[in-house]
Amino acid sequence: VFESINVADITILIQSGARYKFGDLRIANDTRSQTLAERLAPFKTGDLYQASQLGLLNQRLKQTQYFRHVIVRPLVASSVDAVVPIDVILTHKPRDNFDLGMGVSSDVGPRFTGKWQRPWVNDSGHFAGAQIYVSSPEQYVSFDYKVPLEDAIHNYLSYQAGYQAQNDNDTSSHKWSISASRHWAVENSDWQRSAFLRLEQETFIQGAEPEKSTRLLTPGFTFSRLRSKGGVDINWGDKQTITAEFASE
């Protein structure tokens, strides 16, 4: 204490003890989810323990859309030599999930929407889904299929097929499309990458003109990233997307 200048130096001594480390992931009687969680985990056995990494694993498991509920927690009481096993409790979604909707609006009249998803087509985590929309001026149906590779969020293949019909005043059109895309992420980069190839064929009639058809083969690339600040209580965020397409008729 320096009384002459009213200043005191404070020395704080802290003995935090041994630093905990991550142990194995434990998922009871669920081999396919065990593999999925290990691929998504932002840590490995032996890494220094950080609570934020558990929150990140929890978030990633929810993003896969395989599970209705996710709990990730440390088993401190079961730790040995400061190595803490991680307990993962997962509640799977039903084998098939359906969303149905009906409505009426002044511009299109009655309309119907339907959505189907099957999160686990097989033990490899393939994901299938379909959507349908029906109204007087427009109808469409689409089907998509996702094949996880290194992980189910950032590295996967996806396939889409769809049909759309429109009848707007004096124009009637029918469009079919199929596409395939490869999505991947690069280590130490927050940019998500995808390359795609899309084939579209459209037939349309306008007024009294004869029927016309177009066919487009479109390859392309997309770069996107999602940023946020504030941790769990996000107070800022943005999404940036860059897409380049090249069409050949």
Feature-to-residue mapping (PLM):
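Post-signal-peptide, soluble extracytosolic/periplasmic N-terminal scaffold domains
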Residues: 1-13
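Alpha-helix N-cap/helix-start motif at coil-to-helix transitions, marked by capping-box chemistry
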Residues: 28-31, 213
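Conserved "repeat-terminator" motif of extracellular CCP/Sushi domains
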Residues: 10-19, 86-94
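Interfacial loop/beta elements and low-complexity acidic/Ser/Thr-rich segments
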Residues: 1, 19-24, 210-212
